């Protein structure tokens, strides 16, 4: 089946709620409506911006989706600083990024923690954007495919086959995040294809063919065309470029198959 490309802008810890409103307006009103039928575009702001973004998208009936950068594995309770799945669902989030390499590195998130967070997202009707990917030393040793597929399968343990349809996978080689280095289109295709094969082996080809696999790591308008032209790359998880309205809009338009008018 044809998979609709997804361009998701991960703002990380950037932009206050006023800056968020300005950026969402710029993206929504710069990208021609016809492109939204060809590519799904989502913004992933910090927690403090989500309500403002939701209000703008809902109030102006914008075609953008929005999501969150993380979720607690817990439903509620004495977990100071945590934000739960039910809270994010009430904020209208379509997506929640789970297992980003920065969470794995700076917050010591294991595959087991990531698995519990994936479950928390799915339980409340949202789609996890599940991040997997290798550090430079693993890439240089030739273990990048095994590393990434192992992370994937571990993060999906215990899920029902039907739940897998709701998962978005993002391959983000750690050495390419925020470094200016980018995996070649062939590099991205190699791992994204391997991830889809791993899904097919575990859950069947029909399910695997429905799951969108994104690439993340120094994605720009100058390389999105070649990346998304690969058979198993279904879009991008965009970092730094998503903070620039003009660049993110151009990137999204190119993913839809056409330049800005």
UniProtKB/Swiss-Prot annotation:
Enzyme class: isomerase
Pathway: Carbohydrate biosynthesis; gluconeogenesis; Carbohydrate degradation; glycolysis; D-glyceraldehyde 3-phosphate from glycerone phosphate: step 1/1
Catalytic activity annotation: D-glyceraldehyde 3-phosphate = dihydroxyacetone phosphate
SUPFAM superfamilies referenced in this protein's UniProt entry, alphabetically: Triosephosphate isomerase (TIM)
Sequence positions that bind substrate: 10-12, 178, 218, 239-240
Family annotation (Gene3D superfamilies): Aldolase class I
Signal peptide: none
GO molecular function: triose-phosphate isomerase activity
Residues the record marks as active site: 100 (electrophile), 172 (proton acceptor)
Highest taxon above the source species: Bacteria
E.C. number(s) listed in UniProt: 5.3.1.1
GO biological process, one term: glycolytic process
Cellular component GO terms held in the UniProt record: cytosol
One Pfam family it belongs to: TIM
Compartmental location: Cytoplasm
Keyword list, A-Z: Cytoplasm, Gluconeogenesis, Glycolysis, Isomerase
Electron transport among keywords: no
Homology family: Belongs to the triosephosphate isomerase family.
Function: Involved in the gluconeogenesis. Catalyzes stereospecifically the conversion of dihydroxyacetone phosphate (DHAP) to D-glyceraldehyde-3-phosphate (G3P).
PANTHER family: TRIOSEPHOSPHATE ISOMERASE
UniProt subunit comment: Homodimer.
Record-given protein name: Triosephosphate isomerase
Organism: Saccharopolyspora erythraea (strain ATCC 11635 / DSM 40517 / JCM 4748 / NBRC 13426 / NCIMB 8594 / NRRL 2338)
Source lineage: Bacteria, Bacillati, Actinomycetota, Actinomycetes, Pseudonocardiales
Gene name in the database record: tpiA
């Amino acid at each position: 089946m044809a998979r609709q490309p997804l361009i998701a802008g991960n703002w990380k810890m950037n932009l206050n709620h006023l800056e968020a409103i300005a950026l969402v307006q710029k993206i929504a009103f710069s990208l021609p409506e016809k492109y939204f039928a060809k590519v799904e575009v989502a913004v992933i702001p910090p927690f403090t911006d989500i309500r403002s973004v939701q209000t703008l998208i809902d109030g102006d009936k914008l075609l953008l989706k929005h999501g969150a950068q993380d979720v607690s594995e817990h439903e509620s309770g004495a977990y100071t600083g945590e934000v739960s799945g039910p809270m994010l669902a009430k904020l209208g989030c379509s997506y929640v990024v789970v297992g980003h390499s920065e969470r794995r590195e700076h917050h010591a998130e294991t595959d087991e923690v990531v698995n519990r967070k994936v479950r928390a997202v799915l339980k409340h009707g949202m789609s996890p954007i599940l991040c997997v990917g290798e550090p430079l030393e693993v890439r240089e040793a030739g273990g990048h495919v095994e590393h990434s597929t192992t992370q994937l399968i571990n993060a999906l343990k215990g899920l029902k086959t039907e739940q897998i349809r709701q998962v978005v996978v993002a391959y983000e080689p750690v050495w390419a995040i925020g470094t200016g280095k980018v995996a070649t289109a062939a590099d991205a295709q190699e791992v994204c294809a391997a991830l889809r094969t791993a899904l097919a082996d575990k859950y069947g080809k029909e399910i695997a063919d429905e799951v969108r696999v994104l690439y993340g790591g120094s994605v720009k308008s100058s390389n999105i065309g070649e990346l998304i032209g690969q058979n198993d790359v279904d879009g991008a998880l965009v970092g730094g470029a998503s903070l620039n309205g003009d660049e993110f809009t151009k990137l999204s338009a190119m993913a839809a198959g056409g330049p800005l008018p």
